[in-house]
């Protein structure tokens, strides 16, 4: 149903956000920004 779609979208968004935060953090640590 709709709830499972919403959950999937939220999961994907969370994954993307985590990926973005990780890459930002690692580039700051490596000073490659």
Curated annotation (Swiss-Prot):
Annotated signal sequence range: none
Predominant place of localization: secreted
Gene from which the chain derives: GGN3
Species: Glandirana rugosa
Keyword set includes Repeat: no
Disulfide bonds listed in the record: 27-33
GO cellular component: extracellular region
Protein name: Gaegurin-3
Superkingdom of the organism of origin: Eukaryota
UniProt family annotation: Belongs to the frog skin active peptide (FSAP) family. Brevinin subfamily.
A Gene Ontology biological process term: defense response to bacterium
Tissue: Expressed by the skin glands.
Function: Has a non-hemolytic activity. Has a broad spectrum of activity against both Gram-positive and Gram-negative bacteria, fungi and protozoa.
Compartments (UniProt record): Secreted
Subunit field text: Monomer.
Keywords for the protein's UniProt record, in alphabetical order: Amphibian defense peptide, Antibiotic, Antimicrobial, Disulfide bond, Secreted
Keyword Magnesium: no
